[in-house]
């Protein structure tokens, strides 16, 4: 068992009851193009087209053969683009239940599948996009191979769902999914990472290795798992996938149908009844959160409060990789002499406010509690960084765009979510996730 001692479990109010409920019905879903790093779409549909569930919507020009399929049947009502015609979202009004079927197998056949059979079914169904690489966090090329595959069956993000609750209901599908993934590279390790105290289904597979992690966030991030088990570099790549996509893989191969359901956490200080709800990948979040939120101006986030995406306008949908929807209040109010008050209702990791010594949960808002200023190395980053890297030096190199120095200090192991806690504790109010992405893009472009 690997214990993570450095990090932070954010004391935020609105933790979800770990019981699965039906969510609000939604009649609109979307695929968010900007979730897929470096993707350039070649559209196969246009506005007004009627599509079936599992039908191809677009293909990645920069990654030939990787296709993106409809999570539901219906009519394409909008193809939203941003600056430089970047694809923001493809919106579907859900109608009917027509679907495309794919190859299916009995449970007994799964352990005899060839790598090519597994790959072909994943690609044709669009489930290949559930896999991501590290470094760079991109959908892998269909011709590439990984040193190993990581399955993340734990989640320590603030307000997250407990994976064991979800997996208890879909145990056979999860086991089937593990079996299928083990056949993708039979000679390479399949790492299943779970919480030390969790009881989740597994499978008796030759290349399956089970790892227990415990401790504070980011103990549940796949970047943490990769760092301690099979570190990556410029010449070494691993792939990873989350536990709900493993369930979808299991269902695809045994039913021949694309499975788009998600069980997510709907939680946060502004949610009336925080709980786990069933919904669909790409669900319209305005519809999903209707009558669920407290009065006032709220910010709905697809993902964690630490590193999720703001859900509004053409991005008002549940992300492909998001397993939670978090809602906090917009914090635009000015506080008279706020900096000089004891501030018993505010939290700080630096013990500068009275609230630090309280054991209560806090109603966090979007307020940054200060303006941007120079990066100040006072030990905050080291407090929340459990990986064997020098965070202050790495973050400095990221800020100035020193790609060589950043690589030497381990930036290739990281994704935006791995630096979310550094952004949270930063006295200078830097957003290190977006800075990291710029550096990673530059490294990949320049080789």
UniProtKB/Swiss-Prot annotation:
Keywords: Ion transport, NAD, Sodium, Sodium transport, Translocase, Transport, Ubiquinone. It catalyses: a ubiquinone + n Na(+)(in) + NADH + H(+) = a ubiquinol + n Na(+)(out) + NAD(+). Coiled coil: none annotated. Composed of six subunits; NqrA, NqrB, NqrC, NqrD, NqrE and NqrF. NQR complex catalyzes the reduction of ubiquinone-1 to ubiquinol by two successive reactions, coupled with the transport of Na(+) ions from the cytoplasm to the periplasm. NqrA to NqrE are probably involved in the second step, the conversion of ubisemiquinone to ubiquinol. NCBIfam families: nqrA (TIGR01936), PRK05352.1-2 (NF003759). Belongs to the NqrA family. This is Na(+)-translocating NADH-quinone reductase subunit A. It comes from Haemophilus influenzae (strain ATCC 51907 / DSM 11121 / KW20 / Rd).
């Amino acid at each position: 068992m690997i214990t993570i001692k450095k990090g932070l479990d954010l004391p935020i109010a609105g933790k979800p009851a770990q019981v699965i409920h039906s969510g609000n019905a939604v009649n609109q879903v979307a695929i968010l193009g900007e979730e897929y790093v470096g993707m350039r779409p070649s559209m196969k549909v246009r506005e007004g087209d009627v599509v079936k569930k599992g039908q191809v919507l677009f293909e990645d020009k920069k990654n030939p053969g990787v296709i993106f399929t409809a999570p539901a049947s219906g009519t394409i009502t909008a193809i939203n683009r941003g600056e430089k015609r970047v694809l923001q979202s493809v919106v579907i009004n859900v109608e009917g239940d027509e679907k495309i079927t794919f190859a299916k197998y009995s449970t007994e056949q799964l352990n005899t599948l060839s790598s090519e059979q597994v790959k072909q079914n994943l690609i044709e169904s669009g489930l290949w996009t559930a896999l991501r690489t590290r470094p760079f966090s991109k959908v892998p090329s269909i011709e590439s191979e990984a040193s190993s595959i990581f399955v993340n069956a734990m989640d320590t993000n603030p307000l997250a769902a407990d994976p064991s609750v979800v997996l208890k209901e879909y145990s056979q599908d999860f086991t089937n999914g593990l079996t299928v993934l083990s056949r993708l590279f039979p000679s390479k390790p399949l790492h299943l990472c779970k919480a030390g105290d969790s009881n989740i289904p597994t499978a008796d597979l030759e290349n399956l290795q089970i790892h227990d992690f415990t401790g504070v966030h980011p103990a549940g991030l796949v970047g943490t798992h990769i760092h301690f088990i099979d570190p990556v570099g410029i010449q070494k790549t691993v792939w990873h996938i989350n536990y709900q996509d493993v369930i979808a893989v299991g269902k695809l191969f045994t039913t021949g149908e694309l499975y788009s359901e998600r069980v997510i956490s709907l939680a946060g200080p502004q949610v009336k009844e925080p709980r786990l709800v069933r919904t669909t990948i790409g669900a319209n979040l305005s519809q999903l959160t209707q009558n669920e939120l407290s009065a006032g101006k709220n910010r709905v986030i697809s993902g964690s409060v630490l590193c999720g995406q703001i859900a509004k306008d053409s991005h008002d949908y549940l992300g492909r990789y998001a397993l939670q929807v978090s809602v906090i209040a917009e914090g635009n109010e000015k506080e008279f002499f706020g900096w000089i008050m004891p501030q018993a209702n505010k939290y700080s990791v630096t013990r500068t406010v009275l609230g630090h010594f309280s054991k209560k949960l806090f109603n966090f808002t979007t307020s940054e509690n200060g303006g941007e200023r120079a990066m100040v190395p006072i030990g905050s980053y080291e407090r929340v960084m459990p990986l064997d890297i020098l965070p202050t030096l790495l973050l400095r190199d990221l800020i100035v765009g020193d790609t060589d120095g950043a690589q030497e200090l381990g930036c290739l192991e990281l994704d935006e979510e791995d630096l979310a806690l550094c952004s949270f504790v930063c006295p200078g109010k830097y957003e290190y996730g977006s800075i990291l992405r710029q550096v990673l893009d530059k490294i990949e472009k320049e080789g």
